[in-house]
């Protein structure tokens, strides 16, 4: 059985990953909500722009970030697991949309890694009995 300091460090790492996934999603929501015409300025967003406006994407990202915040604030393991799965899935969707728009962008890999981290975190949490 792992020692108490190891379990505490492992819990802190899981919370840090969860917080990072939430913060990146919230940051993307804020960037798209600002009146900067992000979709116009970057060809990497053209697939997202074809699907919905910046404001709609900002609302969707903020909703997902809110689910992440709820998961961070609760002690319920099922809610935490569910929120991480929602965050990881949205990061994966964003990675896929960037890949469709511009495969050479670094955003594809960045959001893909974040999605993988989220799914790893979900696996660890479910493996430990949520």
Label each PLM-derived region with a short phrase.
Residues 1-10:
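Short, Lys/Arg-rich, polar N-terminal cytosolic tail immediately upstream
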Residues 14-24, 57-60, 64, 80-90, ...:
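Hydrophobic alpha-helical transmembrane segments of polytopic
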Residues 15-59:
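Hydrophobic transmembrane helix segments
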Residues 45-49, 104-113:
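Non-cytosolic membrane-interface motifs at loop->transmembrane helix junctions
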Residues 76-79, 85-110, 127-130:
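Membrane-helix boundary connector in multi-pass membrane proteins
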Residues 26, 62, 69, 92, ...:
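Hydrophobic residues within the alpha-helical transmembrane core of Major Facilitator Superfamily
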Residues 66-80:
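Juxtamembrane helix-break-helix junctions at the cytosolic face
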Residues 115-130:
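Membrane-water interface at the C-terminal end of transmembrane alpha helices
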